[in-house]
């Protein structure tokens, strides 16, 4: 087992962290697929409103690669298809039947898996709708099934606040996880399984499987950060990664012959009354998660996917294909009289401009930026927290000058989109958003 130490990064001291308690949610009335939240996919619908669907029925495919299909997370009928600007498909809503029907997929035993060719295995995963669980670095797109990756990284947990713990989703399912690992071993000769150095559960229960422990502040255990520290050459840049919880879905597909929809999600944040792990299903409504568990006063910001890497959603929306956390924090619209002159003992900040650096207890955070966007002052704060040694302030300026090649030389593609540069920037510049959009534009140019 190799230990990787990341010097840079930052851990925010935020309140509202979830407990280790696990609650099983009742079945929701509706679930949904959110094509808009799946990067680099141009959806082509295969259903229309009022069409009947089973769990595992095709709902849409990628126009660029029709082999890449996305399946229904519920059995019932298509209740609604919601569009955004320029007819972007935002949500495909499915009203569930009391007794859901399942599409049948082949059941594969461990003996069958041992003698199976890689090409056949890949085709079965794609037909089963789980190929999008794999993401390819550095753009985090769905990988090409015809390419053998230099490595597959299994990320068991995340140092980003409010992510599910391995002991919550792996408890009593170790055998299923081991079968999922055997599936991954057929896809690449180099399988890496990483966990945080402070995760005792994974290191004790999966001692024979964990290959790397990641030591350091957020985002030390991000697959991109791990690859940055261990890669030996540029040919490893296009490695794949998959989350530990998704490995269970692969195993369930082959073990049961049914499209798996189980999900363990986290509800947290200072405005959540019951902060805990919840066992539910893919595409669950956000208001189903928060029902009776949150202060619904209309002042909460619903953040899906984490406070750094997530996105704001309406409370009437649904959990996305990749997301497994819901955070409720105040909007922060209230104005503060002479806020600039106050010592800020309870204002979280990485700098020592406020006295909050003396406060070691967790602090409630809101969405107030406490200022507007202003010019970059070359303070270097963003470079001090960047885990992959980019100098974001200079990369940002090359992008503004439209010098994309120079930005690539600065290490733009190594950016793991952790959001720390945006968080610590005193000029309130959305550095992560700028870098992410630039990477996306560069990726689309290569197609």
Task: Describe the predicted segments one by one.
Residues 30-35, 75-77, 81:
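Translation machinery proteins
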Residues 47-61, 79-80, 420:
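Short, well-structured beta-strand-loop connectors
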Residues 68, 82-288, 292-343, 347-351, ...:
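Buried, small/hydrophobic-residue-enriched core segments of structured protein domains
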Residues 67-75:
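Short coil-to-beta-strand transition motifs
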């Amino acid at each position: 087992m190799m230990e990787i130490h990341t010097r840079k990064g930052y851990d925010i001291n935020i309140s509202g962290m979830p407990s280790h308690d696990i609650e099983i949610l009742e079945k929701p009335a509706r679930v949904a697929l959110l094509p808009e939240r799946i990067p680099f996919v141009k959806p082509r619908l295969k259903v229309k409103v009022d069409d009947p669907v089973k769990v595992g029925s095709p709902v849409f495919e990628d126009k660029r690669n029709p082999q890449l299909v996305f399946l229904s997370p519920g059995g019932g009928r298509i209740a609604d298809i919601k569009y955004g600007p320029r007819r972007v498909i935002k949500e495909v809503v499915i009203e569930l039947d009391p007794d859901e029907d399942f599409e049948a997929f082949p059941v594969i035993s461990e003996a069958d898996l041992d003698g199976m060719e890689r090409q056949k295995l890949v085709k079965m995963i794609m037909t089963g709708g789980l190929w999008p669980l794999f993401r390819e670095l550095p753009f985090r797109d769905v990988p090409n099934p015809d390419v053998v990756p230099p490595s597959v990284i299994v990320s068991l947990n995340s140092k980003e606040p409010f992510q599910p713990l391995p002991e919550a989703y792996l408890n009593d399912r170790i055998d299923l996880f081991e079968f999922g690992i055997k599936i991954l071993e057929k896809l690449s000769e180099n399988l890496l399984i990483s966990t945080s150095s402070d995760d005792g559960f994974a290191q004790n229960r999966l001692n024979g499987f964990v290959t790397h422990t990641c030591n350091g502040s957020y985002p030390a255990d991000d697959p991109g950060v791990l690859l940055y520290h261990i890669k030996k050459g540029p040919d490893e840049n296009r490695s794949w990664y998959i989350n530990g919880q998704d490995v269970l879905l692969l195993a369930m597909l082959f073990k049961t012959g049914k499209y798996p929809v189980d999900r363990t999600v986290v509800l947290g944040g200072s405005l959540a009354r019951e902060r805990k792990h919840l066992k539910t299903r893919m595409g669950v409504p956000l208001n189903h998660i928060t029902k009776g568990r949150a202060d619904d006063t209309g002042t909460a910001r619903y953040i899906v996917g984490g406070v750094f890497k997530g996105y704001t959603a309406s409370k009437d929306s649904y959990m996305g294909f990749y997301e497994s956390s819901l955070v409720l924090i105040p909007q922060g619209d209230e104005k503060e009289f002479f806020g600039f002159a106050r010592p800020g003992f309870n204002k979280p900040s990485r700098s020592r401009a406020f006295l909050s650096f003396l406060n070691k207890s967790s602090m409630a955070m809101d969405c107030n930026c406490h200022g507007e966007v202003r010019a970059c002052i070359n303070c270097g704060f963003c470079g001090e927290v960047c885990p992959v040694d980019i100098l974001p302030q200079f990369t940002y300026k090359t992008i503004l000058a439209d010098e994309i090649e120079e930005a690539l030389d600065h290490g733009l593609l190594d950016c793991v989109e952790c959001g720390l540069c945006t968080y610590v920037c005193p000029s309130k510049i959305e550095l992560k958003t700028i870098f992410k959009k630039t990477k996306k534009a560069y990726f689309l140019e290569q197609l």
